[in-house]
Regions:
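Glycine-rich flap/beta-hairpin and adjacent strands of clan AA aspartyl proteases
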Residues: 117-127
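Short, small/hydrophobic-residue-rich motifs at membrane-helix boundaries and re-entrant hairpins
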Residues: 1-113, 130, 134-152
Length: 152
């Protein structure tokens, strides 16, 4: 008899599925940025916003955090993570907190700024954790198809 999906220890997610999820999420995030920018247009009287504007950059940064944070805190899966059958969680399997989401997001930004070194770290860590996993005390695991069917 096979153990129930919740009793099976989670398998850490490797680098390639994570990068696949990042690619999917980046396409969705781009669409979210377009909508977030459109919301600002009435306040600029229809004028284009400059990409280097620090307020605009900060605004998009916050939009990005809330995009990822919402999905991570509420179910542990962005659409990209769901498509690749991955989930972000605490080591005990519970959903992450907003504080962990913030730490994870900020550390992931540092990882990207360091030419992805924090993500390449996954290849050398025994539990396949990147800098963002380590610093936020979270993990990214593979989930079964049964788990995906049970989540609305």
């Amino acid at each position: 008899m096979n153990p129930a999906p919740s009793q099976t220890p989670p398998v850490p997610a490797g680098l390639l599925p994570r990068l696949g999820a990042v690619f999917y999420d980046s396409l969705l995030l781009l669409a979210v940025w377009f909508c977030a920018t459109a919301i600002l247009l009435p306040f600029t009287h229809g004028e284009a916003l400059r990409a280097g504007n620090p307020l605009y950059t900060s605004y998009l940064f916050m939009v990005s955090f809330f995009f990822y944070g919402w999905f991570w805190v509420h179910g542990g899966q962005t659409l990209g993570l769901r498509a690749w059958r991955l989930r972000v969680q605490r080591p005990d399997g519970r959903p992450i907190t907003w504080w962990q989401a913030l730490l994870r997001f900020l550390t992931a930004m540092v990882s990207w700024a360091a030419l992805g070194l924090g993500f390449w770290w996954i290849l050398f860590d025994k539990r396949k954790r990147g800098w963002h996993d380590l610093y936020s005390e979270t993990e990214t695991v593979r989930v079964s198809r049964d788990y995906l069917r049970s989540v609305p």
